[in-house]
């Protein structure tokens, strides 16, 4: 059924059509003001499902830890050693992992040495040993690290007494019922590959990735991780955003108390150390990915594949964006300039 675009949608579609060029094959976006859809636009070559990349960190990992905190399973003083007593650096606080201030190495090419013939659960045991030995040099400043969120996955397993896939499935069923959010176990897509936005021509997998997670380490782990791995639609991403909005505004059905959501979404480290709440990005003074108009109370996150979600509680404005900007190669950074402009266009058009 054809739907009529609003004037905002018409204008935004024209702006995007003129802008995407060699930036990305397509963009899917949805904006909510006051919890109501005010903009729903698809431009270019778009598909139903997208690789969420690091949005996994908020849709899964941060949300699971926030809910665990809400039920009293850990405190702001809790350390890795409280849950993983054999870990080599037991005094790292969970809050340091959430704010990327632990000092753990930002990234390591685990995919180059992991035995991919092992079942994914055995690969996780191997990964734990690698994290034990990973470099860790705290500086007092935030250094974005995938390894910190990988470690949080083992904390979640200990908190729940279940493997990571079961932890994810429980969260999905309780917090996102009816969603199509999925991790691709053993890197097997749950839908026909044509339904997925293709990402990069991978030099070592020697094929165009479609329905396979773009992140090399997550792929080598069997598609299951806490730093990347989720696939979903714009309905799924916006659904998460509305769930977060309900938590922050204390609305009926929210999965955590408003006081917990307020704690996790406020600035957690000094500005000179970085722009982080507990698991969420905050708008930077210069070059914020949410553009120039979102308030300092806004929270969000981005994904390497060209995804993002930002919510401004002062404007009560939620913007969800999916793209496959890595299709032409990960070195194409043009989307990093387009994304804040999209947020500016939306705010200026309302």
Which role fits each region the language model picked out?
Residues 21-28, 43-97, 135-147, 225-228:
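Short active-site loop at a secondary-structure junction
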Residues 13-16, 51-76, 152-157, 237-240, ...:
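Active-site SXXK
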Residues 246, 260, 265-268, 285, ...:
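Short, gly/Ser/Thr-rich active-site loops of penicillin-recognizing serine hydrolases
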């Amino acid at each position: 059924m054809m739907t009529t675009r609003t004037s905002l949608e018409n204008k935004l579609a024209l702006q995007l059509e003129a802008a995407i060029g060699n930036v990305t094959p397509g963009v899917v976006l949805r904006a909510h003001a006051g919890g109501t859809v005010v903009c729903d636009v698809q431009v270019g070559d778009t598909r139903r499902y997208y690789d969420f990349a690091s949005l996994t960190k908020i849709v899964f990992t941060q949300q699971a830890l926030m809910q665990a905190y809400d039920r009293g399973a850990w405190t702001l003083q809790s350390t890795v050693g409280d849950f993983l007593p054999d870990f080599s650096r037991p005094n790292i606080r969970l809050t340091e992992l959430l704010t990327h201030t632990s000092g753990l190495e930002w990234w390591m090419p685990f995919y180059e040495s992991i035995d991919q013939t092992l079942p994914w659960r055995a690969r996780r045991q191997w990964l734990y040993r690698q994290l034990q030995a990973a470099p860790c040099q705290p500086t007092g400043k935030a250094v974005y690290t995938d390894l910190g969120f990988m470690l949080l996955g083992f904390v979640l397993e200990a908190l729940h007494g279940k493997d990571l896939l079961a932890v994810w499935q429980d969260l999905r069923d309780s917090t996102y019922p009816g969603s199509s959010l999925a991790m691709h176990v053993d890197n097997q897509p749950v839908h026909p590959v044509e339904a997925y936005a293709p990402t990069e021509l991978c030099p070592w997998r020697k094929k165009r990735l479609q329905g396979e997670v773009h992140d090399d380490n997550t792929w080598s782990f069997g598609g299951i991780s806490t730093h990347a791995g989720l696939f979903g639609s714009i309905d799924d991403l916006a659904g998460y955003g509305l769930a977060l909005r309900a938590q922050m505004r204390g609305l009926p059905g929210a999965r955590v108390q408003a006081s917990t959501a307020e704690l996790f979404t406020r600035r957690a480290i000094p500005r000179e150390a970085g722009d982080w709440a507990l698991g969420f990005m905050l708008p930077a003074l210069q070059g914020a990915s949410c553009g120039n108009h979102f308030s300092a109370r806004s929270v969000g996150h981005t994904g390497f594949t060209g995804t993002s979600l930002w919510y401004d509680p002062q404007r009560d404005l939620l913007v969800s964006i999916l793209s496959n900007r890595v299709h032409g190669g990960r070195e194409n950074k043009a989307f990093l300039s387009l994304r804040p402009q999209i947020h500016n266009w939306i705010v200026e058009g309302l």
